[in-house]
A protein has these predicted regions:
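Extracellular/periplasm-exposed beta-strand and loop segments of Gram-negative cell-envelope proteins
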Residues: 50-75, 100-136, 161-189, 217-246
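Residues on the lipid-exposed face of transmembrane beta-strands in outer-membrane beta-barrel proteins
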Residues: 43-45, 82-86, 139-143, 157-161, ...
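Repeated loop/turn-to-beta-strand initiation elements of outer-membrane beta-barrel proteins
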Residues: 91-94, 149-151, 200-208
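Sec-dependent signal peptide recognition
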Residues: 2-8
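N-terminal signal peptide c-region/cleavage motif recognized by signal peptidases
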Residues: 15-17
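Outer-membrane beta-barrel "beta-signal"
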Residues: 40, 241-256
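Outer-membrane beta-barrel biogenesis signature
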Residues: 19-43, 50-55, 256
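Short, contiguous, helix-prone interaction/anchoring segments in small proteins
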Residues: 38-64, 73-77, 83, 87, ...
Length: 256
């Protein structure tokens, strides 16, 4: 008779353990936060859309009447840059890059004259042409504005220095059959930029970046202006307030 209660107790204990096991529910796995932080390499290609604030020379003040028929501008030009950056967290990063901005053709047209008995007498015109290029060094900071399915909009700003070079400059005065040339000259300027764009994370390490930048590149100037036969030398031509609207396609490669 003793064996029956023992067997019954064993059955009761086993059924209780099985019931308790049925009640246990394994907790859901906790989401793993994405990894941020670390160095990255960056590179980009793009096109510039540049503007000129003004073209200035001391001789403009030596004539009674002077006006621009075409105030001057630059053609679009290619650009390319490489750099290195650091991602501090999921919303803040910074980088520095060096960028070469290729030759952009320049043209402008003015005329000058004096007051005659019947009104303005135009004495001549100046047809200006040349090319401009830059080497740009810039440090930037960016704020990533959220993350949606691998897409990250961002805004940023940067400061740096731009080495602006004017080359192949010439001034052709058709009415007087005069031609002058400007030597190639380069000047360093303070530069600043505002950035905006959108990035797409292709892999854990690779991110594509489509961006826009407003660039303020400072000023530039030619070398001394010389007549075609070297008989006359004048001061350089000055290019004031050079700006650009840049479109760039680039990548970022994480080193972490």
């Amino acid at each position: 008779m003793t064996r029956l209660p023992i067997a019954f107790a064993a059955m009761l204990l086993a059924s209780t353990s099985a019931f308790a096991a049925d009640l246990y529910v394994e907790p859901d796995p906790q989401p793993v936060a994405p990894a941020f932080g670390g160095f990255y390499l960056r590179g980009h290609l793009g096109m510039s859309n540049q503007q000129l604030g003004s073209l200035e020379h001391t001789l403009f003040d030596d004539v009674e009447i002077h006006e621009f028929l075409d105030e001057g501008g630059f053609d679009s030009a290619p650009l390319a840059g490489i750099g290195v950056g650091y991602q501090f967290n999921d919303w803040l990063r910074a980088d520095a890059f060096v960028e070469y901005r290729g030759d952009a053709s320049f043209s402008a047209l003015d005329r000058y004259g004096h007051t005659g008995g019947a009104g303005t007498v135009w004495d001549g015109t100046n047809d200006y042409s040349g090319t401009k290029s830059e080497w740009l060094l810039m440090a930037n900071a960016y704020v990533d504005v959220g993350h949606w399915h691998g897409i990250t909009p961002y805004v940023g700003a940067g400061i740096g220095a731009s080495r602006n070079t004017i080359s192949h400059f010439q001034d052709v005065n058709v009415p007087t059959a005069g031609v002058s040339y400007g030597d190639t000259a380069s000047t360093w300027n303070f530069a600043w930029a505002l950035h905006a764009g959108v990035a797409y994370q292709v892999t854990d390490r690779m991110t594509l970046d489509l961006g826009y930048s407003y660039m303020n590149l400072g000023d530039a100037k030619t070398g001394d202006l010389k007549a075609y036969d070297g008989s006359v030398t004048n001061e350089p031509m000055h290019f004031k307030d050079i700006t650009s609207h840049d479109i760039k396609l680039g990548f970022r490669y994480s080193l972490q």
